[in-house]
Amino acid sequence: MAIGLIGRKVGMTRIFTEDGASIPVTVIEIAANRVAQVKTLETDGYRALQITTGTKKANRITKPEAGHFAKAGVEAGRGLWEMRLADGEGEGIEVGAELNVDIFADVAKVDVTGQSKGKGFQGGIKRWNFRTQDATHGNSLAHRANGSIGQNQTPGRVFKGKKMSGHMGAERVTTQNLDVVRVDAERNLLLVKGAVPGATNGDLIIKPAVKA
């Protein structure tokens, strides 16, 4: 496991190479990630870093949160995230330390995790790419219906996990092996090739690619 950072999706643009090729990129803002807690085998049973980033209005911070951040001596952020550590990883990182985008300076590919855009309640055609039924030939009301969802007496039920209508999107999604195009440490920006999950301003978890 490699240490990751929390970023914010700014949007998409494109950059041009020296030979004129256009590369679509997603711009991710990675402000300073502050270490709020260091978990150890002795106290917690596993090794991890608990980090926060961004800011939060004072009247939105609960008393337990305020005490937790005050104990760590860091400014309250918009959330708390945990990064598991492998043996020997993260040595020397203490509570109150700041992690910045420059840790990706020597990383070629990253995995980006975020929450996909929510689509609400959708039918099988949009949610699962089902084909539509006949437009004519006697079909009056079932143009976008799912169709058969099972058998009669045997097994006499609908199998679990059957693809049907339901809530679509708003799920945790990871896009793997995205090329790192540019690291702008001065402006706290990371540019990766292609699209990443979620809407603009959504929180993202960026880690060095596990399959690189």
From Swiss-Prot:
GO MF terms, alphabetically ordered: rRNA binding; structural constituent of ribosome
Keywords noted in UniProt: Methylation, Ribonucleoprotein, Ribosomal protein, RNA-binding, rRNA-binding
UniProt PTM comment: Methylated by PrmB.
Domain of life: Bacteria
GO biological process: translation
Role of this protein: One of the primary rRNA binding proteins, it binds directly near the 3'-end of the 23S rRNA, where it nucleates assembly of the 50S subunit.
Quaternary structure note: Part of the 50S ribosomal subunit. Forms a cluster with proteins L14 and L19.
Protein known as: Large ribosomal subunit protein uL3
Originating organism: Shewanella loihica (strain ATCC BAA-1088 / PV-4)
Lineage: Bacteria, Pseudomonadati, Pseudomonadota, Gammaproteobacteria, Alteromonadales
Name of the gene this protein is made from: rplC
